Amino acid sequence: MHVYIAGGTGFIGKCLTKKLLEQGNRVTATGTRSNFPLKAHPRLSYVQADLTRKGRWQESLAEADAVVNLVGKTIFGRWTKAYKAQIRESRILTTHNIVESLESSRQGLLINASAVGFYGSQGDTILDEDAPPGSDFLGEVGMGWESAALEGEKKGIRVVCARFGIVLGEEGGAVNKMLAPFKFFIGGPLGNGEQWFSWIHIDDLCAAMIWVTEHQELKGPVNFCAPNPVRNKEMTKIIGRILGRPTFIPTPAFAIRMVMGELASALLSSQRCVPKKLVSADFQYTYPDIESAFREILKK
């Protein structure tokens, strides 16, 4: 199988590339860097490109059997008007350009990144793929992002909108930001700590994406998260126990809002997501609970 990974130089893209190559697949990865940050491999091609703009990179899509789109500006920044525009455009415009380039006669599958932020903050409500979208900024972006991807269905392409939980792994993602306070003995819950945290280990995420390529019944929105979401305060206790650090110093919600601005709404939001479709398709998790995930990441 030949897989085209848009955004292949990022945290998730590098992991997925490695796993696909290990299984004997061919990979074409794109990114904005001048060189791909992995060792040269005979079945790996790299295209440097800005996918928000049309260009020759679209021609290289023609040979792929499946396309994985991971492109998107990180949400971890000050949400100025300009930054929010970058968050939106990097996702929706890139997806539009990719879908426009797909050929129904060739590509059978588009896995397009989305996020559990699609649901907004819904408290203790259990959220499977049929749950409604949120009305906040990330919910709005998620709807636009997925709508752009689902245009591919008009070409007869199987489209999977991969609603990622927070991705945990040793080499990137949110882990370093999450662990930083614990290193200084000031780790604690965010706000009241009651908000639900939907997450997934990077290895399970990449395995699930490969699983999707092999299971035709999976289409439309799919929650890519572990089957056991956890409250922020429970996760904090688990991290503290693994690291041998105290966890009794909460960060007040007002302080988070003062420092982070509008981004605080995302950090304090509650999404109790369950991967109904992946579980129904018998996908097996290596790290179904957050303690096993953090013990692997921290080698404890």
Predicted segments, located by residue:
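N-terminal Rossmann NAD(P)H-binding glycine-rich loop of SDR-like oxidoreductase domains
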Residues: 3-23
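Conserved Rossmann-fold NAD(P)-dependent oxidoreductase catalytic core, especially the SDR/UDP-sugar
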Residues: 96-136
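Conserved beta-loop-beta element that borders a ligand/cofactor-binding pocket
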Residues: 114, 147-170
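Glycine/proline-rich active-site loop of Rossmann-fold NAD(P)-dependent oxidoreductases
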Residues: 143, 155-157, 168-177, 212-222
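Alpha-helical substrate-binding/gating segment
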Residues: 179-187, 195-229
